[in-house]
């Protein structure tokens, strides 16, 4: 029999319920408020009192209102039909909801129960299967969507029957499997999984090593991220976080893109809803939305649903990874998620940590980031979840707790800087403060050596050192003036500017420059490295600046020309001729 309870206290979204039976941490309950059932989650249990966070506004709730516990955790519904959907943090389909504001207690189904899917069996009668094994597949927006043995099944099973190829609804039985005790279990296209638990259906989770190509030079060349890697983008307001995220999600070599807009301002979420359906996928020529899922929670939505949205997004990402697909998940912004954790922690009167965030903030962030990764599935296929979160530190302060906690666990750090944004040097990623720990991985080094160039990482480290030198000399020039430093200092400074203007800066709104292939980046890196290693002969600092401005200008024309086109070759020859004039 389901456990019931009575409301004893209300503090905004935190409600104390006195229960008449057993309840567990993270269990879902529904509180009846004037006939409307409000979804809630247990976050703490002390004696007979369960503290629950309500996913809706608690206006109109009274002491004495009844609550009913469902006996399960917050779960997502997993099955075909999720691609192209717009969900809220609890996986309710926003497109099915009417009105400007969402009605309280209005919950919609995540999947379309009536749609017919073309099913094709992959398993045969008599096959031995375990949780996560592929039984068949349907085509969802041109992607193969594998129908798997439910993740909750434990131990080994034998396939008793599989449906023939044909059209079926998501709730139709497509297979029957028999467990070790001889008991039969029906399998449909749909399964449920609790969002707070990672899906464990894989054989091995090695260190990721395969470069994830994004087409953004400051990422791919200077601070690469890998398939199954983690990264984060901190930056103050107006530094281009959202544009950079859009560019990554549009251009990255991923099969599925999941965007969790957890607590962003309403106008930014509207921008995502308005823009994404019109974006073209450069890989397939189709609409990007066909392989995208958007999970949106604005800042004015209740705190609890903001927290749930990132877990919902990650669980869906893990589900697609279990099909052997490459998934890219973007969260914008994890700061709002951390603020939601802070709010509930404060209401529970827990011991506060720095800036009143929970004491265990680092552990919560680390556990979440650990769910990303590259895996070998039980059938030998590979899948990955690459996670990139943005952080919006108050006042651009990169020493605040959320940034510090994320820095400990994310392997890539792309620091957006107000100073670079003010000078219109986009993407405004600071090349000196940013880093990628993957450059230190031996597996990644050997992958780069075998697939791109053996001296790639050496050249990148050399250019990074030159950027450091350029920054130091720029400070000296600012203090002493142009005449106060030797000419060779000016040459070093302008070589750093060349790296910045040619490789680091990129036009996200130009159809050619927005996306650089790895082959193109390799040629650019070699060319810029050669220029930086060349000794030039100049009389004074004016000659240096005039010459390098000319080189940068021609290089910009190369960047705006289609790769290996007539214009591209023409500007490259022009560049070679100008460089030959000045070599010592």
Residue ranges of predicted features:
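N-terminal accessory targeting/assembly segments
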Residues: 1-103
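P-loop NTPase catalytic core
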Residues: 221-222, 228-552, 556, 564
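P-loop NTPase nucleotide-binding/switch module
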Residues: 99-133, 137-140, 145-152, 169-229, ...
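Active-site phosphate-binding and catalytic loops of NTP-dependent enzymes
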Residues: 74-78, 93-99, 182-185, 205, ...
């Amino acid at each position: 029999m389901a456990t019931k309870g009575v409301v004893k206290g209300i503090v905004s979204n935190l409600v104390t319920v006195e229960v008449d039976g057993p309840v567990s941490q993270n269990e879902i309950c529904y509180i009846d408020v004037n006939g409307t059932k409000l979804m809630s989650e247990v976050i703490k249990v002390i004696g007979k009192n369960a503290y629950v966070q309500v996913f809706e506004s608690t206006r109109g709730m009274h002491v004495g209102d009844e609550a009913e516990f469902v006996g399960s955790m917050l779960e997502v519904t997993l099955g075909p039909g999720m691609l192209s959907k717009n969900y809220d943090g609890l996986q309710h389909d926003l497109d099915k909801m009417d009105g400007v504001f969402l009605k309280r207690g209005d919950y919609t189904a995540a999947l379309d129960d009536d749609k017919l899917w073309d099913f094709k069996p992959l398993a045969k009668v008599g096959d031995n299967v375990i949780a996560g094994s592929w039984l068949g597949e349907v085509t969802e927006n041109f992607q193969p969507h594998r129908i798997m043995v439910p993740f909750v099944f434990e131990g080994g099973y034998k396939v008793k029957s599989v449906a023939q190829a044909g059209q079926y609804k998501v709730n139709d039985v497509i297979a029957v499997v028999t467990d070790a005790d001889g008991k039969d279990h029906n399998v449909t296209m749909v399964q449920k999984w609790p969002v707070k638990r990672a899906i464990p259906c894989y054989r091995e989770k090695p260190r990721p090593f395969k470069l994830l190509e994004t087409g953004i030079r400051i990422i791919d060349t200077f601070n690469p991220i890998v398939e199954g890697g983690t990264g984060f983008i901190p930056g103050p307001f107006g530094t281009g976080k959202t544009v950079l995220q859009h560019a990554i999600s549009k251009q990255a070599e991923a099969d599925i893109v999941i965007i969790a807009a957890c607590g962003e301002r309403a106008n930014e979420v509207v921008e995502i809803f308005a823009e994404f359906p019109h974006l073209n996928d450069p890989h397939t020529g189709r609409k990007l939305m066909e392989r995208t899922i958007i999970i949106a929670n604005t800042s004015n939505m209740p705190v609890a649903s903001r927290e749930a949205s990132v877990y919902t997004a990650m669980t869906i990402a893990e589900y697609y990874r279990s099909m052997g697909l490459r998934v890219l998940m973007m969260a914008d912004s994890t700061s709002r998620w951390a603020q939601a954790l802070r709010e509930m922690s404060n209401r529970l009167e827990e011991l506060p940590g720095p800036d009143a965030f929970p004491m265990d903030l680092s552990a919560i962030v680390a556990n979440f980031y650990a769910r990303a990764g590259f895996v070998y599935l039980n059938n030998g296929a590979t899948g990955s979840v690459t996670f990139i979160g943005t952080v919006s530190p108050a006042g651009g302060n990169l020493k605040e707790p959320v940034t510090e906690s994320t820095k400990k666990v994310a392997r890539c750090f792309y620091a957006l800087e107000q100073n670079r944004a003010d000078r219109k040097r986009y993407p405004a990623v600071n090349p000196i403060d940013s880093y990628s720990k993957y450059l230190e991985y031996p597996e990644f080094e050997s992958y780069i050596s075998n697939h791109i160039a053996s001296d790639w990482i050496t050249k990148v480290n050399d250019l990074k050192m030159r950027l450091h030198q350029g920054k130091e000399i720029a400070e000296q020039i600012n203090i002493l003036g142009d005449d106060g430093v030797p000419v060779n200092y000016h040459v070093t400074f302008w070589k750093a500017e060349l790296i910045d203007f040619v490789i680091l800066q990129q036009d996200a709104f130009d159809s050619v420059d927005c996306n650089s292939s790895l082959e193109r980046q390799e040629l650019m890196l070699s060319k810029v490295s050669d220029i930086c290693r060349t000794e030039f002969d100049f009389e004074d600092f004016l000659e240096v600046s005039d010459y390098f401005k000319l080189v940068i200008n021609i290089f910009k024309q190369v960047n705006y020309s289609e790769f290996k086109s007539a214009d591209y070759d023409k500007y490259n020859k022009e560049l070679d001729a100008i460089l030959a004039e000045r070599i010592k």
